[in-house]
């Protein structure tokens, strides 16, 4: 019986990708970023190993949603105290913390396990076009989340 070759975790060199979120659909952007973080785009993908890459998302404040989600999509958090439920809409959260919108969307598309939490730490989200990771020489990842639009 043949044994499936597993990639050696020490030899896996993660790459850095730069994704521009300006005028991109939130869900489709998050799905593409989650794929990069998990490493599913690689031929040596292994579900129980962290084979993913680092992803830098810029212009998080310019991400868009369709329909009435801007006013109807709700984000909830609880302080842990009685009556401590806080609810805000997509528009309110995007105005207050635009990075959080992208982070929550991507986190929901990663496995809810220890490995998923470790993969989530490889996501770096920034408001505006600037980021402090120039030393890693990130590759621009071409992304078009608008169906029918030219790239």
UniProtKB/Swiss-Prot annotation:
It comes from the Bacteria. One of its GO terms (cellular component) is cytosolic large ribosomal subunit. It comes from Synechococcus sp. (strain JA-2-3B'a(2-13)). Belongs to the universal ribosomal protein uL13 family. CDD domains: Ribosomal_L13 (cd00392). This is Large ribosomal subunit protein uL13. GO terms for molecular function: mRNA binding; structural constituent of ribosome. It holds the Pfam family Ribosomal_L13. One of its GO terms (biological process) is negative regulation of translation. Keywords: Ribonucleoprotein, Ribosomal protein.
